[in-house]
Amino acid sequence: MDKYDKIIDLTKRRGFLWNSFEIYGGIAGFFDYGPLGAILKNNVINTWRKHYIVNEGFYEIDSPTVTPYEVLKASGHVENFTDPLVECKDCLESFRADHIIEENVDVDTEGKTLQELQEMIEKNNIRCPKCGGEFKEVSTFNLMFATSIGPGGKRAAFMRPETAQGIFIQFKRISQFFRNKLPFGAVQIGKAYRNEISPRQGVIRLREFTQAEGEFFIDSRKKENFEKFESVKDMVLPLLSGKNQEDESLSSEEKVVKMSLSDAVKNGIIAHEAIAYYIAVTKKFLMEIGIDETKLRFRQHLPNEMAHYAADCWDAELYTDRYGWIECVGVADRTNYDLLAHMKNSGDDLSVFVELDEEHEIEAYEIELNYKLVGRTFKGDAKVLEESLKELDDKKMEELVEALETEGKYVLKTCKRDFEILKEYLTAKKVKKIVKGEKIIPHVIEPSYGIDRITYCVMEHAFKEDEDRTVMGFSNAVSPIKVGVFPLVNKEGMPEIAMDLKNKLRENGLIAEYDDSGAIGRRYMRMDEVGTPFCITIDGETLKDRSVTIRERDSREQFRIPINEVVPYIKDKL
């Protein structure tokens, strides 16, 4: 067995991970978390919450997983949320084209076009792994799970492909909550869905998974000189830039360069200080939950693999024994793509008013509507026209005035309808105005975390074995069981003392497990396998002087302390 098989075997035996729907044969791309796995995953999530909600001042929202078609049409997911698909001509089995190539040829398919993937399959004579048949042409496959809202299927919808859209849709409400003062951040943690073509990587590639995403809204002019960056500028990280990825003269080791965030921004490797700051937050979080620093790197997306909404994106990749480097976190500059898209398609104003450092005088057009004529012409839509005219920027206003002067009419397109405006509908004149601020569409920095992949990597990076034991060396922040409590023997009042101590630990918010089964060595072994950092034994000495033996998992060191000092000692160590 390789390390992955050993970990999966342990996690199934000890209640971390189980195949979903197992008694019905199981379905690829779905896993259940057992009792300890659920605690481990929640500890990862709660550590993430600490970093983003407590430390960074973001607030959390919770929105539906079912998302109307028009929302994901506006966001670009209907057109762009796809993977390359190949289907066998004989057995009709489907596979991801890029994955099937990488399994047969030592080549990186990241960012390749459909045509390039097709040429690779033909050049290397790649056949169906199931029956040996030829493949059909490479095509695209939309990864969203389709559904409908209500009876009759009249309202098309999807299971959300990301949690982010729920935040963008509620932007006006979130902005009001923050008193419309940039910058501010919102997070959402929950299920997202990808109808993966052929998920064959266990817990690494799931069809239903948990995301933790933050959306940090900022004035685009503040990204270059980001106030918080000063606190992390000297942090050194292993960076795999887009430029180095494309430099064929460099070896794979030479392509990854360790440098400070300050130098990375100064040299134009990372786009700006704001995205660099959230790369640093990501590093801090991953270190706290026990990720091996030597198995972490940050890789920049190449231009041809960048998401449709992103201006720059860096993935935190974690190394795994079987699957190599896997993407676990994406830190992206989404610009104002999403807010603009939802403004255009919903008709709602998703701008924020920002005050200028200094007031200044400008010349601007002031419009006076002929309400009687406009009301008679557009009836109930007259108000829509009035509001739409107010939202026009200087350039659009110039276009309107020029068209009315030269052609006598202008067509104003809005999300609700097109308005043909005639010259007699309004009067436009230039006036001098004192400007104290302006409306802007904020840009978004998005740190997006795949919690299931991260949780698996926490387990793999914690997994250690030698001649006499197997250990899950979890960090104290995420270990599911904090303390094991054992009576040395099941007599002389030891079980009662041990049970009482276990209850005291739990009353103090610590998950403690009582175990009186088998030899003390086997009990230590069971606790080592589930990553419990401390074990406490009640023995004969306890009956004499009320002291107990504490054993530390990693060092195996044992020492005695008074029983009434156990709770404060453990809490201090954790």
UniProtKB/Swiss-Prot annotation:
Gene from which the chain derives: glyS
Positions contributing to ATP binding: 194-196, 204-209, 327-328, 450-453
PANTHER family: GLYCINE--TRNA LIGASE (PTHR10745:SF0), GLYCYL-TRNA SYNTHETASE/DNA POLYMERASE SUBUNIT GAMMA-2 (PTHR10745)
A Pfam family per the record: HGTP_anticodon
Cellular component terms per the entry's GO annotation: cytoplasm
Catalytic function, reaction form: tRNA(Gly) + glycine + ATP = glycyl-tRNA(Gly) + AMP + diphosphate
NCBIfam families, sorted: glyS_dimeric (TIGR00389), PRK04173.1 (NF003211)
Biological process annotations from GO: glycyl-tRNA aminoacylation
InterPro entries xrefs: aa-tRNA-synt_IIb, aa-tRNA-synth_II, aa-tRNA-synth_II/BPL/LPL, Anticodon-bd, Anticodon-bd_dom_sf, Gly-tRNA_synthase/POLG2, Gly_tRNA_ligase_arc, GlyRS-like_core
Gene3D superfamilies for this protein: 3.30.40.230, 3.30.720.200, Anticodon-binding domain, Bira Bifunctional Protein, Domain 2
Keyword Amino-acid biosynthesis: no
Name under which the protein is recorded: Glycine--tRNA ligase
Keywords noted in UniProt: Aminoacyl-tRNA synthetase, ATP-binding, Cytoplasm, Ligase, Nucleotide-binding, Protein biosynthesis
Binding site for substrate: 96, 162, 209-213, 446-450
EC number: 6.1.1.14
MF annotations from Gene Ontology: ATP binding; glycine-tRNA ligase activity; protein dimerization activity
HAMAP family: Gly_tRNA_synth_A (MF_00253_A)
Subcellular localization, as worded in the UniProt entry: Cytoplasm
